[in-house]
């Protein structure tokens, strides 16, 4: 079995060594420009078109939860990866736990009004504030994939009303489900904390815009953990400046690294991290990929295959 590997920043030799340990008999090599030798599987992140073009592969694995970089290249180069070759993404591999930690910590930060107390501290003011009630602090999650389900599960013990919006209706315990465009407005109107975990598709690009934000209750919060292109940053800033939004926590941006001239840097009600909410953990990812390849070789069912029509 021949496997080609490409990632611009990962420790390639570590991945090759560990993959060969978990897949006895497999030969894994780093792909470099001009390498047209046959391969059975490709493990990639932001791959050059020529890496995949014209190859008779059994499957391609994206080394992250998102596949938008591959799908965007396919729109211009459809022969890069024919539909006959399945494309897989990492379903969890430790990302679920990281998203849980991030989401719970930020929701509690807002619920306990730590942002307000930080502002009071900077103003040298000693002022106890009224508490928020958990049963009135509704958290709405956009996106009902593996990560959305994990985040909802982690928030349940805290007593917040939970709701989810997705393409199709979900039956999650203790979570109110809203489905499709027709129910998006109702979902937004009752949401105090909006958590974005949507996939990056043509339909979801720019979805968090002026029209959508206007439907939130006043003094709501936005937590973006998905992709920067989901948020129209000018509209987000306008909602913050008008008081419609009380705060925003952003892990992803329309341009990364965030340009120095962006007004997001200096905004007092914007907190941010540099796209680190959930990173690929090598050992968990290697184990998942090795197990999935082994199941494919045995002809057994697997999960994680991307529906290219939907984009996730």
From Swiss-Prot:
- GO MF annotation: an example: NAD binding
Task: Give the annotated active site.
Answer: 227, 275
Question: What keywords tag this UniProt record?
Answer: Cytoplasm, NAD, NADP, Oxidoreductase
Task: Give a Gene Ontology cellular component term annotated to this protein.
Answer: cytoplasm
Which reaction is this enzyme known to catalyze? glycolate + NADP(+) = glyoxylate + NADPH + H(+); (R)-glycerate + NAD(+) = 3-hydroxypyruvate + NADH + H(+); (R)-glycerate + NADP(+) = 3-hydroxypyruvate + NADPH + H(+)
Q: Which cysteines are joined by disulfide bonds?
A: none
User: Which SUPFAM superfamilies does the UniProt entry name for this protein?
Assistant: NAD(P)-binding Rossmann-fold domains
Protein function: Catalyzes the NADPH-dependent reduction of glyoxylate and hydroxypyruvate into glycolate and glycerate, respectively.
The family note in this entry says: Belongs to the D-isomer specific 2-hydroxyacid dehydrogenase family. GhrA subfamily.
Name under which the protein is recorded: Glyoxylate/hydroxypyruvate reductase A
Record lineage = Bacteria, Pseudomonadati, Pseudomonadota, Gammaproteobacteria, Enterobacterales
